[in-house]
Amino acid sequence: MVQLHNFFFFIIFMVVLCGTAAPVLLKWFVSRDVSTGAPFFNGTIIPILISLFSLLVYLHSRKIIRSMDGAKSGVLVRASRPILLPDIIGRSSSETRARKALFFFVPVLHFCLLESKGDFSYLESFCGVLCLLFFCTFFFLARDRSAKRERARRRKGQTLRPNGNEQRRNDKMRCSGHPHLDLERRVEGFGPLAFPVPPELGGACVGGVPPEIGLEALALPRSRQLMAMAVGHDYYQKVPMKMNISHGGVCICMLGVLLSNTKKIQFTQRLPLGYELHMGKERCCLRGLDHLHGPTFHSICGNLMIYKPSLTNDRLMFEHDESLHADLLLINFPASYKNGKLEHFLHWWMKNRKHNNFWLTMFPEKRYFRERTSTAEVAIHTNLFTDLYALIGTGSSRTGGWYTTIMKLPFIFFIWIGFMLASLGGLPSLLRQLQKDKLRWN
């Protein structure tokens, strides 16, 4: 079923990558525009998710049923009194207590940072903490050394030989006077266990167990091993690092999707030249319009400036550039155009150090073709935390301005990072499975 999981996540991440990264990459490298949006995602992800998710639930339920049926044939050591496992009643050391304290302190700190610095609600901060805990569990899973040794033995085709400590313990546990107890039989991953031998094979014993050999002499399975016996021997195994990376990428991708949808900000308003649009902490100003002419179209290119005013000065001043001092209306920027086309519709962040405010410029475009059709070219600004989308619609100076749409989507970059990590961890496993003659989908 691992192959089906990889195939499931691979399709989802490819669809998300095509819907988020492809427009930007194609615009940067080949200057080609592609249209993506809600129809693309709904028509691609929803049918695939419904079909594959139902199949995954069916296969997973079958695997659990088979594991539970196989566990009924396992042999457990019975006793007249309850046995307290040492893993449960053992006193925790200072290192264990420090690790538990750190495990509780990190989520609280993460919650406070998201709620205060990230300006998230309590529900969004709690969801972020859950994603963090889910991500950390894959790195704090205990390692089963016996399962690791058994896998190494299977790879090399050699017999598993006990080390010196285990050999001395086996010699002490060897019962020469009572052959009805076989203390040398081993169960995969559980160490030495006591299995009764029929009395006709040698000797008899009062009560079934000799008085000199008690339950303390038996190497009982630990709590993690009892869990493995309950659901199958292949349930508790060491999780490889590539699986940690893959699941961590899935968590980051889920966190990016959650935060980008809950913290989405969108404004659509008729904006005259020189007026500002308030978007929370940021402001958007329509500085001017430029007319462009292409081979088959003519277009109107908006000149938008998005900035965040400082706390000391509410107005943005451009003392470092004399051309941007007072009049912000109908200012042409010939350096931004080349051969009648927009060379760069994206300008990186710039900072006014004196007034401690940052600003950027965006150039959305409205194209009119000869076939009496029009398309809207979206201006996109991307950084590690926020994506800004600007779109200009119809309007004129006589009607009072142009309809302008500004959209702010935070943490879209987390989706990209999650996709890269999940692909990095799942690609080697997928390539290794494709080299086999027959794939085991279950």
Swiss-Prot record:
GO CC annotation: what is one? Answer: mitochondrial inner membrane
Region Disordered, annotated ranges: 151-175
One Pfam family hit: CcmF_C
- Name the membrane topology term: Multi-pass membrane protein
GO BP terms in the entry: cytochrome complex assembly
Carries keyword Transmembrane helix? yes
Q: Where is the composition biased (Basic and acidic residues)?
A: 166-175
Q: Where are the transmembrane segments?
A: 6-26, 39-59, 122-142, 411-431
Primary localization class, coarse: mitochondrion
Q: Where in the cell is it found?
A: Mitochondrion inner membrane
Keyword list, A-Z = Cytochrome c-type biogenesis, Membrane, Mitochondrion, Mitochondrion inner membrane, Transmembrane, Transmembrane helix, Transport
Q: Which InterPro entries match?
A: CcmF_C (IPR032523), CCMFC (IPR044955)
Q: Does the keyword Transport apply?
A: yes
Family, as annotated: Belongs to the CcmF/CycK/Ccl1/NrfE/CcsA family.
Q: What does this protein do?
A: Forms a complex with CCMFN1, CCMFN2 and CCMH that performs the assembly of heme with c-type apocytochromes in mitochondria.
Miscellaneous comment in the UniProt entry for this protein: A stretch of 270 kb of the mitochondrial genome is duplicated within the centromere of chromosome 2 resulting in the duplication of the gene. The expression of the duplicated gene (At2g07723) is not demonstrated. It is also probably not RNA edited and therefore differs in all the positions known to be edited.
Q: How does it assemble?
A: Interacts with CCMFN2.
The name this protein goes by in its record: Cytochrome c biogenesis CcmF C-terminal-like mitochondrial protein
